[in-house]
């Protein structure tokens, strides 16, 4: 998947930014959220999040649902590195396992359970 955040900011800039965030907020995780291209789901209004490391993936999904004002009857799927993360994992655990070389965790969302990458 092409990440707009990576295209808009150099690797050096992203590394410096994530290091600053982690130093200032050690109990939080820097997350980039973008829609899977081609998905019919609503666009999100912001893509950078600072998430408490102790919330679960399921709780984070609820935050994203609320951000895009998705009705409860509509489905949403989160992907990290083209796979659906276990919903019981904490965001801190997911971050440690899947963070990018730049220090951010990249999460894609879609209304369909397909990657479309």
Swiss-Prot record:
A lipid is attached at residue 116 (Phosphatidylserine amidated glycine). The keyword tRNA processing does not apply. The precursor molecule is cleaved by ATG4 (ATG4A, ATG4B, ATG4C or ATG4D) to expose the glycine at the C-terminus and form the cytosolic form, GABARAPL2-I. The processed form is then activated by APG7L/ATG7, transferred to ATG3 and conjugated to phosphatidylethanolamine (PE) phospholipid to form the membrane-bound form, GABARAPL2-II. During non-canonical autophagy, the processed form is conjugated to phosphatidylserine (PS) phospholipid. ATG4 proteins also mediate the delipidation of PE-conjugated forms required for GABARAPL2 recycling when autophagosomes fuse with lysosomes. The record marks 116-117 as: Cleavage. Ubiquitous. Expressed at high levels in the brain, heart, prostate, ovary, spleen and skeletal muscle. Expressed at very low levels in lung, thymus and small intestine. It holds the Pfam family ATG8. Its main location: cytoplasm. It comes from the Eukaryota. It is found in: Cytoplasmic vesicle, Autophagosome; Endoplasmic reticulum membrane; Golgi apparatus. Keywords: Acetylation, Autophagy, Cytoplasmic vesicle, Endoplasmic reticulum, Golgi apparatus, Lipoprotein, Membrane, Phosphoprotein, Protein transport, Transport. InterPro entries: Atg8-like, Ubiquitin-like_domsf. GO terms for cellular component: autophagosome; autophagosome membrane; cytoplasm; cytoplasmic vesicle; cytosol; endoplasmic reticulum membrane; Golgi apparatus; Golgi membrane. A lipid is attached at residue 116 (Phosphatidylethanolamine amidated glycine). Residues 117 form a propeptide. The modification N6-acetyllysine is found at residue 24. One of its GO terms (biological process) is cellular response to nitrogen starvation. One of its GO terms (molecular function) is ATPase binding. The modification Phosphoserine is found at residues 39, 87-88. CDD domains: Ubl_ATG8_GABARAPL2. Changing residue 47 to A: Strongly reduced interaction with UBA5. Gene3D superfamilies: Phosphatidylinositol 3-kinase Catalytic Subunit, Chain A, domain 1. SUPFAM superfamilies: Ubiquitin-like. Monomer. Interacts with ATG3, ATG7, ATG13 and ULK1. Interacts with TP53INP1 and TP53INP2. Interacts with TBC1D25. Directly interacts with SQSTM1 and BNIP3. Interacts with TECPR2 and PCM1. Interacts with TBC1D5. Interacts with TRIM5. Interacts with MEFV and TRIM21. Interacts with WDFY3. Interacts with UBA5; promoting recruitment of UBA5 to the endoplasmic reticulum membrane. Interacts with GOSR1. Interacts with KBTBD6 and KBTBD7; the interaction is direct. Interacts with reticulophagy regulators RETREG1, RETREG2 and RETREG3. Interacts with IRGM. Interacts with DNM2. Interacts with NCOA4. Ubiquitin-like modifier involved in intra-Golgi traffic. Modulates intra-Golgi transport through coupling between NSF activity and SNAREs activation. It first stimulates the ATPase activity of NSF which in turn stimulates the association with GOSR1. Involved in autophagy. Plays a role in mitophagy which contributes to regulate mitochondrial quantity and quality by eliminating the mitochondria to a basal level to fulfill cellular energy requirements and preventing excess ROS production. Belongs to the ATG8 family. This is Gamma-aminobutyric acid receptor-associated protein-like 2. It comes from Homo sapiens. The lineage of its organism: Eukaryota, Metazoa, Chordata, Craniata, Vertebrata.
């Amino acid at each position: 998947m092409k990440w707009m955040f990576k295209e808009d900011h150099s690797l050096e800039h992203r590394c410096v930014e994530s290091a600053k965030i982690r130093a200032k907020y050690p109990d939080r995780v820097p997350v980039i959220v973008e829609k899977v291209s081609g998905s019919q789901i609503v666009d999100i209004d912001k893509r950078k999040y600072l998430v408490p490391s102790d919330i679960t993936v399921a709780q984070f999904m609820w935050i994203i649902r609320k951000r895009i004002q998705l009705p409860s009857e509509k489905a949403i799927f989160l992907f990290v590195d083209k796979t659906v993360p276990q919903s019981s994992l904490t965001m801190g655990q997911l971050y440690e396992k899947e963070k990018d070389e730049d220090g951010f965790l990249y999460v894609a969302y879609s209304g369909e359970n397909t990657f479309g990458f």
